[in-house]
A protein has these predicted regions:
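Metal-dependent nuclease catalytic cores that hydrolyze phosphodiester bonds in DNA/RNA
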Residues: 1-124, 128-129
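Short beta-strand-loop-alpha-helix junction that forms the active-site gateway
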Residues: 134-141
């Protein structure tokens, strides 16, 4: 996962849409990820693995390398996987070949200057795009 963050990232849009100067103000501070953020990053990796395996794609199980792995993380990522697979099945009802992209780097700079990020899950069908945003965490440090 990339550590570079977009100035106007989708994940912080609520903040910069309500307070536009906050985007540039944040550049003056070092980006120190909290333990909560590290746990969320690991949960995304586990969720990605579970979805890819369920879609019969190659993936390496990250569980042994996860510092914050817990039964709760396991259950939460199962729920995330199940939701994405349900959406994929629904998409298959209206499209012969839905495209499923997991942890996909996206560039939306056409609409937001220097806009880019990583989409947790994208499901593309004929004339439709479903974007899944997995949230995992307990707090802000």
């Amino acid at each position: 996962m990339s550590t570079k963050h977009a100035l106007l990232s989708a994940s912080s849009a609520s903040r910069w849409l309500h307070c536009p100067p906050s985007a540039r103000l944040g550049e003056n501070y070092e980006d120190k990820p909290s333990e909560y953020a590290a746990e969320g990053t690991e949960a995304h990796a586990l969720g990605e693995y579970k979805i890819l395996k369920s879609l019969k794609r190659r993936a390496v199980n990250p569980a042994k390398k996860l510092k914050y792995f817990s039964e709760e993380m396991d259950e939460c990522t199962d729920g995330y996987k199940d939701m994405v697979l349900e959406l994929v099945m629904s998409a298959g009802a209206t499209c012969d070949d839905p495209q499923v992209l997991i942890e996909q780097r996206v560039d939306f700079s056409k609409w937001v200057q220097e806009g880019f990020g990583t989409a947790d899950a994208l499901i593309v069908t004929d004339g439709n795009l479903t974007i899944c945003d997995y949230k995992h965490g307990k707090g802000v440090a």
